[in-house]
Amino acid sequence: FWYPPALMHMAKADRLLMLIGGVDLVVGPLLTLIVYKANKRHLKFDLASIGLIQVVFLGYGLYTIWNSRPVFLVAVPDRFELVFANEITPKRLAEAKIERFKTLSFGKPILVGAPMPSSIKERDDIMNSAVTGQGDIQAMPKYYVDYSSTVKNLLKHAKPLNSGKDLSIANAKVLQQAAKSYGFRPDDIRYLTLASSRGFAVTLVDANSGAILGHVDADP
């Protein structure tokens, strides 16, 4: 729902789900094994307590997934950045100049652009924020604009699906096969790096319109 299948591994969502499921499945049976005795006086209470513990673990796990869900897919000058809910502070969210970008997505990530400002001071502020671990431009909604307004510049950095200095033969085959699986000819597709704080993947875009066609779990 929040994570496209191709981005599950890149966003580490698969590990989180396995951890939550593993803990919940192990904790219940293990505790039951420890406390279970057929004629134990307080067995029902103990089993109910174990059930409650499992529910608490599950609830915390779901909250963690919710709080770390992807909320914005941001086109910065030369790539895409996937931004998670816990990476944008309420203060920065409130600074968004476009009203619909003041709310974190409840469903799939919202596609936006984030061009670098022309002001040298603002550029310096962004750089300082990035190097001090307080977030780069992709975590600053006040710079968000409609994706369509950034497409022309973004496509200048998009690359063809041919092998070359930027793409190994193996990865070229993976991307070309992915393009075909999405129903497109490789020659009509370009690719861009999709980065996040958790890993990397590749985003396929239409070579002319810049429309996003899909994501590929591949090393850019």
PLM features: what roles do these ranges have?
Residues 5, 58-61, 188-192:
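Intrinsically disordered, low-complexity segments enriched in polar/charged residues with Gly/Pro
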Residues 16-17, 74-90:
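Short extracytoplasmic/periplasmic juxtamembrane "stem" segments immediately C-terminal to an N-terminal membrane anchor
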Residues 18, 45-51:
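Alpha-helical transmembrane segments of integral membrane proteins
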Residues 91-220:
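Extracytosolic and intramembrane catalytic regions of membrane-associated proteins
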Residues 1-35:
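Membrane-embedded alpha-helical segments of integral membrane proteins
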Residues 30-39, 49-77, 82:
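Transmembrane alpha-helices and immediately adjacent membrane-cytoplasm interface residues
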